[in-house]
Amino acid sequence: MAFRKENKVKSFTRIFISLASSDNILAQSSGEVLKPETINYRTYRPERDGLFCERIFGPIKDYECHCGKYKRIRYKGVVCDRCGVEVTEKRVRRERMGHIQLVVPVVHIWYFRSLPNKIGYLLGLSSKKLDAIIYYERFVVIQPGITDKKVCDLLSEEEYLEVLDGLPVENQRLDDINPDKFIAKMGGEAIYDLLSRLELDSLSYELRHKIDNDTSQQRKIDALKRLQVIESFRSSKNKNRPEWMVIGVIPVIPPELRPLIPLDGGRFAASDVNDLYRRVIIRNNRLKRLIDIDAPDVILRNEKRMLQEAVDSLFDNSRKSSAVKTDANRPLKSLSDSLKGKQGRFRQNLLGKRVDYSARSVIVVGPELKMHECGLPKGIAAELYKPFIIRKLMDRGVVKTVKSAKKLVDGRDPIIWDILEYVMKGHPVLLNRAPTLHRLSIQAFQPKLIEGKAIQLHPLSCTAFNADFDGDQMAVHLPLGNEAILEAQMLMLASHNILNPANGTPITIPSQDMVLGLFYITKMRRGAKGEGLKFYGTEEAIIAYNEGKVDIHAFVKVYVDDIDENGTPINHIIETSVGRVIVNGFVPKAVGFVNEELSKKSLRSVISDVIKTCGVSRTAQFLDDIKDLGYMMAFKGCLSFNLDNVIVPKEKETFVQEGYKEIEEILANYNMGIITYNERYNQIIDTWTHVNSRLSDALMKQLREDDQGFNPVFMMLESGARGSKEQIRQLSGMRGLMAKPQKSVMGGGQIIENPILSNFKEGLSVLEYFISTHGARKGLADTALKTADAGYLTRRLVDVSHNVIINEEDCGTLRGLIATELRKNEDVVVSLYERILGRVSVCDVQHPESRKIIVYAGEEISEDKALAIQNSSIERVEIRSVLTCESKKGVCVKCYGRNLATGSIVQIGEAVGVIAAQSIGEPGTQLTLRTFHVGGIASNIATESSVVSKYDGILEIDELRTVEVVDEINNRHLIVVSRLAEMRIIDTRTKIVLATYNIPYASKLFFNDRDEIKKGDLLFEWDAFNASIVSEVAGRFHLENVIENITYKNEYDEQTGLKEKVIIESRDKTKIPVIHILDENGEIRRIYNLPLGAHITKEEKDVIRVGEVLVKIPRTVGKTGDITGGLPRVTELFEARNPSNPAVVSEIDGEISFGKVKRGSREVIVTSKNGDYRTYLVSLSKQILVQENDYIRAGMPLSDGIIAPSDILAVNGPTAVQEYIVNEIQDVYRLQGVKINDKHFEVIVRQMMRKVEIIEAGDTKFVARQLVDRDEVSEENDHIWDKKVVVNVGDSSNVKQGQIITMRKLREENSILKRRDLRLIEVRDSIPATVMQILQGITRASLQTSSFISAASFQETAKVLNEAAIKGKVDKLVGMKENVICGRLIPAGTGLKEYDKIMVETTME
C-alpha cells in the first residue's frame, strides 16, 4: 500500500463542498469496520475489524505492527503478513478513515429534517408523507406501470397487496426499466429510486412555466421554493446528484478524533460518537443476519427502521425528537453537534486556539516605565525566551548540549540573566487583556526584567486596555518570526497607538491622579505670594519659585516663546503662573505656550496638537514627561478631601420649599378638575426635576467659588480626574427622583413622585435608603446582562464586516453623500467640520465669496481645509463615502478617507471592516440597557413646551395653515392646524439658515411668515403633556357613535369627584366614534375622528369657537419619550427589525380622505394632484395623525409609531435609509457621550445593503424572490444583454426551446437552415432580471455571505453546510475568518497578496 513520505502542506486557493457519493466515501476509506467492539478490555489492544482496528486505521505505536512481528523504523511501509497492519507512524490514526457498508440505503437526516425540506421539495412531497416512507410505514409508487396510481402516491400495506393481487403474475417478472412494470417500495431504497429518476432540467422548465402562468399566489410560492432547491442542484454542474442524499456507505471518522481515554480503576471514558457508531454497526449486522435467514418482512422492516434511526442519531442527534441519551439522561453528542456552537469545532478549535510561548499574571502599575515598555517578571521571561537563551548559551560555548542548557535555564542559573537581557533587546512581547474588545486590547511592549511575579504596565496604556490594578490579569505572548517581530515593533508598539481608531482622538491620555496633579499646578489663585512679579524668561520664574519667592499658583508676567495663529514663532509677555511655566517646559516648542488650566478635556486637545505638529515619537516622550509631572504634583498638592469640603448649598431649603409650593398648586388644580391625573403626575415629576437641576447649578456655583476653586472635591470633578456632576449632586445636593421597581421587563420605568430630598452628607432616612437600594441593585444586575449582550453584538458586527478590506486606490465612482451639520432644534450636535474632516471631496469646493477653490475633487479634506469650509457660508459638502463605493471587493482608499488611528490617509490592506465592528462594539458595554442611570435615579429631562429664538433674523414658515383665536383678554394669536409646518430663522445679512424647527400641531404661534424677530422672542408654545384636536371651524358640538361602555367609558376620579369621557376600543367595529361640528341648519361642517384613549373636553351641543380644543390625548405617563434606550435600540437598528408598532407611511404626496372601516382598520386614502391614489389600512387602536383634507408628503407617517426602516427604503430610497440608520444609532451613542466616527457605521450599513431581491428573473439563471449580490446581478445581466432566446426551434437539431444563444450562433444556424430550405429558428430578445434593493439585518447578512465557511462558523452551522453542499459551493477564501480557519495568513494588512510580490533590491552606487 502506498503512503506519503513527505508531509508537505498542499497550497490551495479555494475550498469546494459537495455531497459525497458512495464511491467518494469508499475511495477515501482504508477498510470496512465490521464489528462494534472497540478495544479488548484485558489486553487494552484494539479489536480486529472493530472501531479502533489497527489494520484499518494504522498502528497504535510508532513503527510496530499488532502482533509484534515487525518493530523499528527500518520496516517502514511493510504490511505484516500475520496481522495485516502496515508498519508506519501512529499519527496516521488521525487521518485514516474507515467505512460501514449498509445493507439497505438510508436517507441523510439533514436533507429531510432541516427546513427547507430538500428531498420533500425535489419530490413534491410533504414532510409527513416523507417521514412515512423513510420510516417504513407506507409504500410509495415509483413506477405506476399499468395501474391507475400516480408516481409518489402513498399506499398502506393492504392497498399495496391489493394492487399486486390485481396485477397479472408476469408483470412482476418484467425488467425494472420496462415502463409497464408496477414498482412500489418503502424506506431509503424507495427515496433513492425516486431521486435517481428525476429529470432536473425539464422539472425546472415546468416550474418556471407554472410560476409565470399560475393565478394562485400560494401555488406560485410553493413552486418558487421547489425551483430554488432544483436550481441549487442544477447550479452545482453535475458535481451533485440528488440520489446522493441517500447513503449506502457511512464514513467512519479516524479513531484519534473520537478517542478512548483510560481512567483510573480500569474504566474508559469513550467519546459519544463511538456509542453512536456501535449502535449503527450492531443494527446493520443484525439486519444482515435476518436477511440471510430469510426473516419475515415485518421483522425486516422494523430492523431497517431502527437502522435508519441509528444513522440519524449518528449524524444529528439533536434534531430528533427522541434523541439517544446516556445513562445520566444526557443526549449524546453526534457529528453535527461537534461542529455547532461555542464548544464546536469551528469556534473552539479553528477560530480560537491556545498558543505556545504565552504566560499570564496579575498586573501592577509601573509609573517609571517609558511609554513603550512593560515590566516582565524574571520567571516568565526565562520561560518565554527559553529557546533563544539555549541557542545563545550554545553559541557562546557555555554548554555543549541542549539538555544541559535546559538544565541551566530551569535552575535559573545567574549566568542566564545577562543572556536574557541580550536576547530581549529588540524582541518585543504582546500584552493582551481579556475581554479583547478592540485592537488596542493587544499591544506590543519592549520588556524590562523585574523582580517579583507581577507584570508591570504603563499607567497611560490603561485606558486602551480598560485595565485597573484591582487584581486584573493579563496575558503575554511572544512573536517568534522576524516578520512578526518587525510588525510588533512597527505597528503594534504602545507608543505608536496613541489615537483611538473609533474617533481619532488620543486614547493614551493622563487620567485620575495625573490629571489632578496637572490641573492643580496650572490653576491660578489671587493674592498668592509674589503676585504681579515680572520675569524676563521662564528659567528666572522657575528659579524664583525654587527660592521660595513666588507661589506656584500666583499670577505673574513672563516673557515667553510662543506661536501666533499662522504658526510663526513670536516672543511676548503674557500673564501666567509658575505652574504653567513648569508644564510648558515639557511641551514641544512647535506647539507654542499652553496657557490654560489642564483638565482631561484640554489635555486631549493639547495631545492632539502635539501629534499633528511633532509626530508620534515626540508625543510619546511628551506623554511620559507629563505623566511624571502629574504624579509628582498630585503628591505635592496633597489633594484629598474631608467632610467639610462637601458643601451643601445655602439655597437648598428655599428651593425645596418652592417645589412644595408648586406641588400644592398642582394638586389644587387637580382637585378642582382643571387637569387630569396624568397631567398632575407629569407636572409633579417636572417640578422636582426642575428643583433638582436648579440645585445642581447652585451647588456647582458655590463649589467653584469656594477657596477660589481650590476645593478638592471641585478640582477632582472639574479636572475630570474622578466623579461626575451627578455624583457630586448626590453627595451634597439631593438624590432626586428614583425609578419605580418594574414588575416585569415590559412594565415601563415609571418614576416615584416623591423624590429623595436628602443627600449623602446629611444621610438618608430609612424609607429613602430603602427606595435607593432598589436602584443600586438593579444597576448591578443590568451590568451583568449588558456585558453578554454587548459581546454578542460585537460578534455579529465582526461577522458581517470581516471581509471589508481596503483593496484599491480609487473605485472611480462619481457618487457621494451630502454632509451637512446635524442640529437638534437649534443646537449643533455635530459640526460640519467634524463630518467632513479626513474625507475625500467628490467635486471642487469653492469659497462662495472669493470663488477660490478650497478643496479639489478627489482631495482629502485636512484640518485647515475643513476649518476654511466651516468658516465660510458653505452649508453642504458632497463627500466620498463607503456607502457609495463601487469596488467589487472591499472598499477603496478614496471612499474611506483618513485612517483615524494614524491620522493619515488609509493604506491598502487595512482591515476597516473589523475596525468598524470593534469601534461600535467596544463602547457597547457603556450603553444602558434601559433609560435610567446613577443608582436608579430617574434622568427624566424637564419637558420642553415652548421655543424661544436664540438669534435675530427673519422667519420663513412652510406648509402653514392656522386659525385665528381671540382669548378672554382680547389677545389675538394663531393656532397651527397643519402637521407639516416648518419654521426657519434666516440671517438678514447672509441669508444663512440659523435654526430650523418643526411646529407641532395645535401650537400657539406668535409670529407670521416673513416677520422680523429679535433674540429672546417667544416664537410658539404647545401643550407638552397632551396631544389635542383643535376645531378649525365654529359651530355646534355633536358626538356621533359615542355610546357609554361601548365606545367610551366614564373615568371617575375619586379625589376630585369629576367624570371624563374616555374613548375605549369598541367590540362593535361598525361604530366609530367621531365628532361633528354642525352649522345653524344642522349640516356637518367638519368631522374629527376620535382615537383610543382620547378625553373629550366638551359636552353635546356646546357652542364651539374656532381654534378651541375639542379632545385631549394624554401622552404616556412619565416616560422619557417612547424610546427603546441603549443597546436594545442599537441591536434593533442593526438587525433592521421592524418596530413593534410601526407607523403607516404614505408612499406619495397627496391629500387625505377617509374611507370605510374594514376588519378593525380604518381606510385612509391619499390622492395626489395627478389623480393617482393609494389606500392604507390603519388599525383603529392607533392614533391617526392626519385629518380629512390635510396635505402630506411621501414618507410622512399617517399614524403614531416609529417609521420602519423598510418603509424608508421603499419610499425614500437607499440613501435615505442608510442615513437614517447611521444617524439613529449615532443618537444612542451620543446620548451616552460616546464619540464614534460615522464611517464605521457606514461600513456596517454597506454590508447590510449588499443584497438585492430578484423581482422578475427574466431569462437569467436566477429565481424570483432570490437574494443575490448586487454585482452578481449586473454581471449576469451584462452576460445576456445582447443574446437571444429561442422561441421556436424550427428544423434545427442543435438548439433547444428556451435556450439562450448569441447573435452569431443564430446567424450561422439560420444560414445553414436557409440554404437547405428548412424552417428557421425564431427568437426574441433576452429579458434581463429586475431587482429591488433590500435591507438585511446583520445576522441575516452574515449568514448570506458568499463564503460558506465564514457563515458556518457564525450560526446555524448544519443548515449553512447542507445548503452549501447541495449548491456545490466554492469558497474562494477572500474574507478573514475563512483564512484563519484554514490556517493561512489573513488577506489584510501585511498578509495582502499585493505585498507578497514586492521585491527588495539594493541600489548600486
UniProtKB/Swiss-Prot annotation:
SUPFAM superfamilies: beta and beta-prime subunits of DNA dependent RNA-polymerase. It comes from Azobacteroides pseudotrichonymphae genomovar. CFP2. The keyword Transcription applies. It holds the Pfam family RNA_pol_Rpb1_5. It catalyses: RNA(n) + a ribonucleoside 5'-triphosphate = RNA(n+1) + diphosphate. GO terms for biological process: DNA-templated transcription. This is DNA-directed RNA polymerase subunit beta'. Keywords: DNA-directed RNA polymerase, Magnesium, Metal-binding, Nucleotidyltransferase, Transcription, Transferase, Zinc. InterPro entries: DNA-dir_RpoC_beta_prime (IPR045867), DNA-dir_RpoC_beta_prime_bact (IPR012754), RNA_pol_asu (IPR000722), RNA_pol_N (IPR006592), RNA_pol_Rpb1_1 (IPR007080), RNA_pol_Rpb1_3 (IPR007066), RNA_pol_Rpb1_3_sf (IPR042102), RNA_pol_Rpb1_4 (IPR007083). GO terms for molecular function: DNA binding; DNA-directed RNA polymerase activity; magnesium ion binding; zinc ion binding. Mg(2+) binds at residues 468, 470, 472. The keyword Metal-binding applies. Transmembrane segments: none annotated. SMART domains: RPOLA_N (SM00663). Zn(2+) 1 binds at residues 65, 67, 80, 83. It comes from the Bacteria. Its cofactor is Mg(2+); Zn(2+). Binds 1 Mg(2+) ion per subunit. Binds 2 Zn(2+) ions per subunit. Belongs to the RNA polymerase beta' chain family. DNA-dependent RNA polymerase catalyzes the transcription of DNA into RNA using the four ribonucleoside triphosphates as substrates. Zn(2+) 2 binds at residues 811, 885, 892, 895. The RNAP catalytic core consists of 2 alpha, 1 beta, 1 beta' and 1 omega subunit. When a sigma factor is associated with the core the holoenzyme is formed, which can initiate transcription.
